[in-house]
Amino acid sequence: MTGIRCFVAVDLPGEMRDAIGRLQSRIATEGLRLVQLELVHVTIKFLGDVPETKVKRVTDALSKVTIAPFPAHVASMGTFPGRGDIRVVWLGLEGNFEELSQLVESALSVVGFEREVRGFSPHVTLGRVGRPGPETSRELHSKITSLNDVDLGCFTVDRFYLKKSTLTRGGPIYEDLAEFAL
């Protein structure tokens, strides 16, 4: 069955994206594909292909999520996997993302989505390594270690989105399907 490839996310304000762009330039390494700044976000839940007939029910369910706006900030920088050849470089975030995630999971379970069994780890993907290898991993580990205490400032999470993701050869294209104020 095909449908609309969807996910729930928090967008970052412009000044945070600018700071992330400066950070990306400091970790740029051959083999690391940096995420375009306009695509940077915090994924709360990936839904996969949602039948068009179900999108309204998803939107209605998400509109019932109630949580106060909350402050957030970058708390760490790391990689997936944590050991061995790096595949993803990310920024870890602190804030009330865990509660938002749980509320989104609860709301979507009512309309038939399975709850995520893995623990939620709020993060922003900075880049992906196309062909992981020891040389690229060593260089990235060195750069990340030197930037470990980076402070990108704080921002307020006051809304989240249901987004459509269209995969193209040039990379994904995201479109907001619905916005939910906190």
Predicted features and spans:
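Histidine-dependent nucleotide/RNA phosphoesterase domain, centered on the 2H-phosphoesterase fold
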Residues: M1-L182
